[in-house]
């Protein structure tokens, strides 16, 4: 993870409304590691398989940047270990109980986080990378 990965970065913003007469040149290069990875030793990338998180913008084949050093907040997207299988879920806390839920109405699961049953948070998703082409 020590390799520097740079890509061209345009300082001009892309308008989501009416077009702006922006210039067509690159201002600088950016290192994606600097922008996507805050804690290198605790960060990994995992590919999504399945459709249970579609409603929150995470799709089959997406890449997730995950930081194992972060503590999840209510409704954070997390990678969890559920009986030795890694899954992507939403973290939900209600009073003194913590649950994992799917981000799709088609999948109505609700898993109680219980380390005694080998269910625990592996890391917090910080970025989602998916193809739009």
Residue map of PLM features:
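Short, hydrophobic/aromatic-rich segments at coil-to-beta transitions
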Residues: 43, 73-78
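Short coil-to-beta-strand transition motifs
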Residues: 60, 82-86, 119-120
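Hydrophobic beta-strand signal
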Residues: 65-66, 79
């Amino acid at each position: 993870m020590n390799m520097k990965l740079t890509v061209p970065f345009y300082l001009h913003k892309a308008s989501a409304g009416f077009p702006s007469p922006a210039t067509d040149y690159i201002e600088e290069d950016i290192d994606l590691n600097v922008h996507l990875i805050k804690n290198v030793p605790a960060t990994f990338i995992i590919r999504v398989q399945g459709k249970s998180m579609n409603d929150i913008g995470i799709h089959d084949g997406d890449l997730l940047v995950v930081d194992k050093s972060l503590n999840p907040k209510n409704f954070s997207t997390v990678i969890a270990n559920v009986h030795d299988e890694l899954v992507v879920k939403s973290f939900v806390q209600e009073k003194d109980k913590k649950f994992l839920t799917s981000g799709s109405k088609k999948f109505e699961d609700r898993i109680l986080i219980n380390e005694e049953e080998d269910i625990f948070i592996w890391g917090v998703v910080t970025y989602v990378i998916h193809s739009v082409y």
